[in-house]
């Protein structure tokens, strides 16, 4: 680099073109040497550091830009760090700062970014930190002043499955935009439950929105969420009425691929395949999800033999089936017990469509074979797998062994499954099923002493039997 300090525009261009951590460090060094304090450049540099694979070096350099030796960090740079970091890192950075500094220094965007991180994080601490942030924004008066914070908070609770608190935040908001309504309706739709209570709540809330939304108009996102709720409940009559309402709003499925795909999915899952096909054929633009919805609809409605032809049409149109396509189709075949068709489809994934099967696809085949009583075939299929079977797959076969009396194999698989669970320090929520599956197999063999040992271990690990699960 030249010893003459380049202007901000030149540095900005160089920043955009820097591909490696070394180049970013060189730019960083020039900024420090020449006393540059341009926050927009620092912000880009932070984004660059955070985009690189997580290393101690890049993390420290990003922190150096944000946290001075004395005093508070710059708000813009602090928020940029929260926004650009991985969710778990954002939560840790915020928690560390909030524990040592005044909350009054934080602004609206700080809370939006950290709540967004809590919504995206898979960490067990995300829900706890999010609740703490909820208390902070309420204490500072941001909650009812900022529609953005309210909506982000609602989204956070919905993503974490706490729909009761999400609804509480929604009901307390003084004003609601279409984004707010969509977040709450979408939250209900994305958490399927036994009896479809959440889907019904979504439909009731949509009716309230369409009738008295205080001048706020439903968007295409709203309608996609509502169609998803109808798909879950199977209420065809309401689905047809909503289709008419969609046309009235001006969202035409012929050109709106998201609305069109949602309609295809809704009609298919409500058992009205003719209407699904009508919408499908009218659509001028189709994406991979459109084709997947139509193919899955065929399988679910007993016309799985037509699926291969539709997949060929899909490939000829220039759209290649992907992992999601085959997961959806194999799940449908599993649901209605199309064993041979499922096996043929699985074989065609790699040979005809070039899609490498992943654990979910293998799991569908094992479950399909297990439910059909073809236990030995399922076991041999697992042994031939090029990837290690997971707990879900083993649990499926263990349950099948219990149902069909394959006690020797069931005991072997059940014990292997419990070993996986014992090695995992965190409770995943599925341990009850594993203990029950193994205990049922042992009970069939009359090994009551071992059944009692399992019960004792469950007590020690504080694993409770769920209502509806057999524990012989």
Curated annotation (Swiss-Prot):
NCBIfam families: PPR (TIGR00756)
Family: Belongs to the PPR family. PCMP-E subfamily.
Provenance organism: Arabidopsis thaliana
Keywords, ordered alphabetically: Repeat
GO cellular component assignments: mitochondrion
Signal peptide: none
Name this polypeptide is given: Pentatricopeptide repeat-containing protein At3g18970
Gene (UniProt): PCMP-E93
GO biological process: mitochondrial mRNA modification
Alphabetized GO MF terms: RNA binding
PROSITE patterns: PPR
